[in-house]
Structure formats: C-alpha cells, structure tokens
A protein has these predicted regions:
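Flexible, charged surface loops at secondary-structure boundaries
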Residues: 6-7, 28, 34-37, 57-61, ...
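A contiguous pocket-lining binding segment that forms or flanks enzyme active sites
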Residues: 98-132
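Active-site-flanking structural segment that lines cofactor/substrate pockets
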Residues: 24-56
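Active-site HxH/HxHxD metal-binding segment of metal-dependent hydrolases
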Residues: 45, 49-112
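Generic beta-strand structural signal
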Residues: 32, 63-64, 85, 114-116, ...
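Metallo-beta-lactamase
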Residues: 3-5, 16-19, 39-47, 119-205
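Zn-dependent metallo-beta-lactamase
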Residues: 1-37, 208
C-alpha cells in the first residue's frame, strides 16, 4: 500500500513500507520519498501497480534526484536509468549498498539546480538536508524523525554541542514545511522549533 499526499502546489510525497525493514529496528517501516517540482529526494520506487505515483512522474518528469544520506540509496539507480535524472549525494556509502550510478557530490554550502541549498545538520552522519526555496521546504533523511507523530531530533552523543547549534542556524531560512523520511512525514516551522527543545529520539549509538 502506497500513500500519496499533496503538501503544497508542486510539493508532494509518496509513502510505503521499506523492503529492508526488520522487526526490532529503531525506525518505522513506512518511509517517505519527496517530490518538489522536478526534484526527487531519497526516492524509493513503488510497485508498478501503484499507478498514481508513476502517472504523476510521467506528467512532471523528474530532472534531478538527491540522496540525502549514505544509507538512503534506495532506488536512485532506477530513477537515473528510467528518467535520466542528474543524481546528487554523498561520495561514501555503506558496504553492500553502493549505487552503480556515480553521483555528483553534494556537500553543505552547495547550490544544486533549481536553487536547492545543501545544508549541514551537525550530526556527523554524512547527511545533507536540502532547502527547497521555491516551496519553502526543508527535506531531511534522518536528522529529524516522528515515530509517534511528534517531531524529534534523532539522538547523537553530541546533541547539545553540535547538533542543536547547526539546526538552529537553519531558522535563518524562511521555510514553512519540514519533511522527514521516517514516521509522520510533514511538519511545520513551529514543529521544528519545538523539536529543538524536546529530548532527542533513540539511542546515541544508532547509525541513523
């Protein structure tokens, strides 16, 4: 079952079970992929029968895709092969989950096509969130999560020293939407501000 949800004009998501999820993990089996205009973020291909996603992509063919974190490779190779997208992301990946596509390196401070801004989250997990100015949206892989609906920062040993200062810097951007891969995917600026004041989620030794 794939859920398709509109967030704002031209900004939408599809949400589905991750095929590699195993019981007992520290992340929700339902994961989200995001589309902003012709840009995709962490795309996971839905089954062929889920026509709504594929029809939307046919109507507005993607031109670029971003892998936001080394363990979010998902189906980037398929989208490169089928749509000819320019693919951006890390240069280092987990063994056994290395894309065949040679991604263009995206690092904090870069500006990608369409004015997308690559950001720093302070967690030291090689994640590069992206700000989409046209849609006033921040898109995260794992830096924030919402396993029970409430937006939380994913824990690290240096939450206070590094992560919170980096995330607070993002408040200088005029974003309205905060999008996260795991748990409830769509949040507001107020939710983001509140998350910075809450206790972080999960174990500090997590790979997320």
């Amino acid at each position: 079952m794939v859920e398709v949800r509109d967030i704002a004009p031209g900004l939408w998501l599809w949400r589905q079970p991750h095929p590699d999820w195993e019981p007992g993990g520290d992340w929700d089996p339902m994961v989200s992929s995001f589309a902003a205009g012709t840009a995709l973020f962490d795309p996971l291909a839905p089954p062929p029968a889920e026509r709504e996603v594929w029809d939307r992509l046919a109507q507005t063919p993607p031109e670029l895709a971003v892998v936001l974190k080394p363990d979010h490779v998902r189906d980037i190779d398929l989208f490169v092969r089928w749509y000819g997208v320019r693919a951006f992301g890390p240069v280092l990946f987990w063994p056994g989950d290395v894309p065949k596509t040679r991604l263009e390196f995206a690092q904090p401070g870069d500006e990608l096509p369409g004015g997308l801004q690559v950001l720093h989250d302070g967690r030291g997990k090689a994640e590069t969130p992206v700000y989409v100015p046209e849609h006033r949206a921040l898109v995260f892989a794992d830096a924030l999560t919402a396993p029970h609906g409430e937006l939380l920062v994913w824990a690290t040993p240096w939450h206070e020293e590094r992560v919170l200062p980096a995330l607070r810097e993002l408040l200088a951007l005029p974003f309205e939407h905060v999008l996260v891969s795991h748990g409830e995917p769509v949040h507001t600026r107020a939710d983001f501000e509140a998350a910075l004041e809450r206790e972080p989620w999960g174990d500090t030794d997590s790979n997320a």
